[in-house]
Amino acid sequence: MNRRFVITLYIFFSWITLLAQSGVTPKHEVRAVWLTTIGGLDWPHNYARNQYGIEKQKSELRTLLDLYQRAGINTVLMQTRVRGTTIYPSRLEPWDGCLSGNPGQSPGYDALQFAIDECHKRGMEFHAWVVTIPVGKWNKLGCQRLRRKYPSLIKKIGPDGYMNPEDPRTASYLADICDEITRNYDIDGIHLDYIRYPETWKIRVSRDQGRRNITNIVSAIHNKVKLRKPWVKISCSPIGKFNDLSRYWSHGWNAYTKVCQDAQGWLRNGLMDQLYPMMYFRNDQFFPFAIDWAEQSHGRTVAPGLGIYFLNPREGNWKLSDITRELHVLRQYGLGQAYFRGKFLTDNDQGIYDFVSQFNRYPALVPPIAWSGQPEPQAPSHIDLYKDGMKWDGSTPYYNIYSSRTWPVDTDNPENLIAIRRKGTSLSIQTGNRYFAITGMDRYGKESSARQSHNIPEVKTIDVPLLKCNGTWLTLPPKDKGLDAKLLVVETLQGSVIATRTYQEKFVNVSNIPNGFYVLKSLGRKGVTHRLGFFTVKRNLATEF
């Protein structure tokens, strides 16, 4: 390692320490996770062969999404087209076997629809992850079906089959797959994986022609999806290094030259709304290339994928600091974050889940498609506050709710965000002694101006205040003598249970609950719940690093 690079790293890490102490979190930031379904790697871990199996799959997915939400994740990239197979009822391709245990067989429910609904309940975007060029083992169902339908379209490399990127039918076929998903489901994005030449493909055309071939596929998908639903985001996961840099070599593994991915050109030409470069590297193989993505984003959203699987001793045994340093630099450069893959995040290898939960201690909105040319949506017309809730009038598909003890509520401060991408025009919440503001949000992620609540004098007369919480201990209200509850349940405003506690003492430890606004309920022996109040967990970020 040369002396110049040692000095550069020292400056970087000193700078990162200052960033950690600042505790600044952005209001807009992609925080994504790849949820892998092939072989049930992330989900599901059982087969749906009867109703019990279906419910077990659903319960497992709900648990995963709750964990993602607690870690501040706002975008789920879920593998939807697997290897010429799908996790939804398709007229074009057969069922993947990850759900039922038998390729081609329905699991008895629409897993894609269920996943979308559950993500939206939690205020998270759902992006359908479509594996494009690889279609699996040569004699497996997905590849076999495509070979029978298009005999000359599939090429064999080793034991695997691949769609030929040089055949124009590949572009139209993949566009039809993405159109089918977009037409039939309320997705927020189409996420293209392996949209490139296989590294083992002997490319006999010029690299320029190879890049045109891949770009033609991207363009066909983009045009068909945007014609159907222009607000659906188009993204992909290119190789993590775009090309060799003037001072840093990609070691022969890059998007532009090796596999003909002109990903930065796709941003420049408007074919991509987001990029998730697979940056599973560290130190001088990460930082310069991450900065290159930031500098060549052309105003679009870039969220580098982090190889958190290397934190697992069986995979690479990286140190946690390898990832945390990368996260701080990404945030400083206005880049998002994406985690490969879900299991390694929720398994908390080397404490990564704990760190991310604190790093993303306040909610964040996904950056809007600002280049859509859509007008600013209308703000809600008014807000009515009640003792235990609020209602408002509005015409936008989503709403973001903000709250603080000062007026007007600062809607630029993510600390004040208490609910994001909320559907409907009401919210159950204890409103005492707080001000509220609500913004409307359209399908493109654009926010309206804020409608501020003004009837705080009326709200101050409410006789049930917010519960006191110092960030570590929550003060409980006096327990009614007739209440048989033995447990306390902590929920998000969306209704997701994130913690349970024994209902015995006057105080409850909440030190492991992320910053946020929560509902506290009692749970009786017969499953009856009673709302005891609301509380805010708010800590100083600088003390956590």
Locations of regions flagged by a protein language model:
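Catalytic domains of carbohydrate-active enzymes, especially glycoside hydrolases
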Residues: K56-T85, N184-I187
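Pro/Thr/Ser/Gly-rich low-complexity, intrinsically disordered linker/stalk tracts
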Residues: F355-S395, G445-E458
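Recognizes extended acidic, P/S/T-rich segments that occur
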Residues: Y399-T431
